[in-house]
Amino acid sequence: LGAIAAGNCAIIKPSEITPNTSKVLADLIAQTFDPNYITVVEGDKTVSEELLQQKFDHIFYTGGSAVGKIVMKAAAEHLTPVTLELGGKSPCIVEPDIHVEHSAKRIIWGKFINAGQTCIAPDYLLVHREIKEELVSAMQACLQEFYGENPQESSDYSRIVSEKHFNRLRQFLDQGKVIAGGETDAETRYIAPTLLDRVSWEDPVMEEEIFGPILPIIEYDDLDRAIAQINAYPKPLALYLFSKDKNKQQKVLQETSAGGVTLNDTIIHIASTELPFG
């Protein structure tokens, strides 16, 4: 949008796994702009590969790190500058000095929007041992409040975008201990909003961005150790901290690095028109 608003010519290549959305975008662009200046190109990865052979003035890519590396490598052949908006494992840290019910609602809301398929969803929960049991209980209550006894029947709960993505996510449910949700339906690509306890840093669910309705929970005793674990991972797109303590807030802000940080809430930093994103 920034490139178009600035008056540039642009080729837009939406994802092939969301064809209905891609068609709406293609129709909207075609109705609004001269195709000689701005157009939408649809197709699978072979189309993307062909586009990457062209000499663009700039490439902007949103997606995962693996494909981001492919885009950067192809752009380097022509010395084309790139902007990569990549995902990652966005942590959510919860200290004991919180309002439990408010925090639980904001975490559940941020995690399970679009069944967890947003790039800045909290990827995993780092919760202090002192508050863990109370917070988990509050989050379980929130899930029922938001989506009812059976989330599969809720009009507010989404499905997984593709069969490939569904199968990848379902494998994560075999790790740790499911303490909420866990139900699946392959035919409709439904995965219940799930809380996953007793997860270790070595589990596969902690090795890649989840991008789905599964929230691993890891407890900690010392904030310094929690920060060290976060910093051992690649830089996250988002980071969330729930704490009323100003000193702890400053500590996390100064000792971590992320695309964006929100204190005592989730997701909402993306809505600020005064801040850059990523």
Where are these predicted regions, by residue range?
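Rossmann-like NAD(P) dinucleotide-binding subdomain of oxidoreductase/dehydrogenase enzymes
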Residues: 1-102, 220
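ALDH superfamily catalytic-core signature
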Residues: 33, 66-201, 223-224, 263
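Short internal beta-strands
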Residues: 11-16, 126, 264-265
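Conserved C-terminal structural/oligomerization subdomain of aldehyde/semialdehyde dehydrogenase
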Residues: 93, 144, 190-278
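Short glycine-enriched loop/turn motifs at secondary-structure junctions
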Residues: 52-53, 86-88, 118-120, 153-154, ...
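A generic structural signal for well-ordered alpha-helical segments
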Residues: 3, 75, 139, 173, ...
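Conserved residues at the C-terminal ends of beta-strands
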Residues: 44, 62, 110, 242-243, ...
